[in-house]
């Protein structure tokens, strides 16, 4: 079924330019996934390597989660489902946002192949706005600060990018409140 979905995604006319360049949709799923990370679209480097979070952002995310690279990539217990499966391109102020149809059309069908998901980490505003009952005007800071309101299934996070160092410095509660709660939840799920 997962292979069929991948072929459907590649055959979607809206993805034709990516498929024509030999690019496959980028996500990391398995029927055994217990913790799913839903984040932004892959960047240009990920488009070339096909490996999600294989950078400083990934190092920080794994640190926040309290897990190592082997658990992240090889255990079959961690999945990653971006808000777009392809790099959407560069804009005037950074990467373009994920294309809106991707999550609406494909996420639930892919989620249905992972029946054991207990925790979904929503990394960044696009994922949070899609999955949480929040107002479009609510800031990422406010949503992440209210992380306990969305449990136990969802846990909103800031993006772990080094570009967010200023945000992290301005919001020390993230490291003192959110990260320990995240690490405990992840550890509890993984030891089952």
Regions found by a protein language model. Give the residues of each.
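A polyanion-binding, active-site-adjacent surface
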Residues: 1-144, 148-189
């Amino acid at each position: 079924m997962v292979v069929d979905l991948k072929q459907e995604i590649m055959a979607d006319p809206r993805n034709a330019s990516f498929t024509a360049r030999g690019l496959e949709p980028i996500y990391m799923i398995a029927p055994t996934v217990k913790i799913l990370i839903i984040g932004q679209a892959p960047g240009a480097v990920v488009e070339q390597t096909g490996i999600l979070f294989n950078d400083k952002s990934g190092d920080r995310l794994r640190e926040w989660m309290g897990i190592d690279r082997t658990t992240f990539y090889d255990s079959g217990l961690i999945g990653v489902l971006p808000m777009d499966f392809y790099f959407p391109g560069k804009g005037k102020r950074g990467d373009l946002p994920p294309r809106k149809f991707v999550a609406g059309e494909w996420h639930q069908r892919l989620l249905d192949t992972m029946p054991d998901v207990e925790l979904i980490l929503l990394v960044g505003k696009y994922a949070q706005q899609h999955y949480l009952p929040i107002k479009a005007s609510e800031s990422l800071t406010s949503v992440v600060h209210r992380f306990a309101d969305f449990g136990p299934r969802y846990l909103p996070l800031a993006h772990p990018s080094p570009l967010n160092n200023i945000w992290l410095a301005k919001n020390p509660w993230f490291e003192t409140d959110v990260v320990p709660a995240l690490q405990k939840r992840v550890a509890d799920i993984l030891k089952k």
